[in-house]
Amino acid sequence: MLDNQNIFYKKKILIYGLGKSGLSAFKFLKKDNEITTHDDKIKDDNKKIIKKKFDFIIISPGIDINKCNLSKYLKDNNKKIYTDLDIFYNSYKRNNKITITGTNGKSTTAKILYDVLRDQKVDVRLVGNIGNPVLLEKKITNKTVFVIEASSYQLEYSKLFKSNISIILNISPDHLERHKTISRYVSAKFKLIKNQSKEDLAILNTKNFYIRREIKLKNFLPKIIKIEKNTNNNILKKINNPYFNTDGNRDNLKFVLEVAKIMNLKKNFLFKTLKKFKGLKYRQEIIFQSKNLTIINDSKATTFSSSMSLLKSLTNVYWIVGGQAKKGDILLLSKKSCKNFKAYIFGNNKNFFINKLKKIMKYESFLDLNSLIKRLFLEIKLEKKTKHRTILFSPSAASFDSFKNFEQRGKYFNYLIKKYINV
């Protein structure tokens, strides 16, 4: 239900960036405000925009104020910059919000929480970086609960947004091409906690170095709930879902169980939901399984850290890796921990991955994914080994060197696999 005290009312507003977020802000605000739009991809008269006086500038997550066309103008007017999350919070202050951020596992954790609440008959909406943009939801009442996935790009310029329950799953170096330093990246993530009040809760993975250091260095108002212990084996037995066998998915599960405890959810419905959860497409997705071979499509893995939980839990692995390497990415994998691994490296940046992996495991390199898959299945055919093998497509890199996004990359991998096996 809309809040009456809306500061974004009868104002002059510039919406910068016309992607999903910007367009949703335009639709939400146009009725009661004087709106001007700008997108760097569309030819506009920048001088006219600069001369106008705006009360607010709503910036889309994809806009980097250090690189965009109106960079100086935005920096000079930084105090006026807000986000769609700010508009959303200002409009729906009364509604309960659970917001998830972190380097890895945001979408999966948000989807599990959404499924859990939906199955408990809660009027719940899945929004943000997953699902609808936050401003497109309709038929909202005071009882509506929002599960929000928030990226560092969304949080970076937010000034008002806060959540009743905030979750930071983990932090490892990522998006440094935008944030420049790990310190700035951490600060963007902790915007989620910074705006909270004493009545709010922050659930944090304090085993994580960057999270642990941040809460030692700074004082935050919300009650901090530390996630440190492993998930109880009895609970895992009750859930009985192989999806939660990897370290990463068990870590995500711990946060879900903590929220369920806080919200006093019914355990029988909770375990029933968790038992049937199958995961999201292209995220540790098992696309084929037989007696001797498992094929996993983990195209969403865009850093080494996002591949680690699977790599640590597997043996006898054909690891397909490659793409646009990310600035500051660190591989924390030893030769000892790689039991019978072989890397199949593809793409224009293959030398980066060769240098990272050559002392840890055997490898072959290929110009593209097509020639790699062809060679891999020939090798499997010639092998006489009876051990169970896993083909792991977990690129540990961004997809933009060859693909539009990780979804297109994941879809292409499935297409190639279907040439050799019935997926």
What does each of the following model-derived ranges do?
Residues 330-388:
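C-terminal helical cap/extension that packs against the catalytic core
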Residues 3-12, 23-28, 123, 242-340:
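Nucleotide phosphate-binding/pyrophosphate-handling subdomain across enzymes
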Residues 11-12, 23-32, 46-54, 61-202, ...:
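Phosphate-binding loop of NTP-binding sites
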Residues 6, 41-53, 368:
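Short acidic low-complexity segments
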Residues 18-19:
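Glycine-rich Rossmann-fold phosphate-binding loop(s) that bind the pyrophosphate
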Residues 36-39, 202-206, 320-321, 340-348:
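Short internal beta-strands
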Residues 32-44:
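NAD(P)-binding Rossmann-fold cofactor-contacting core
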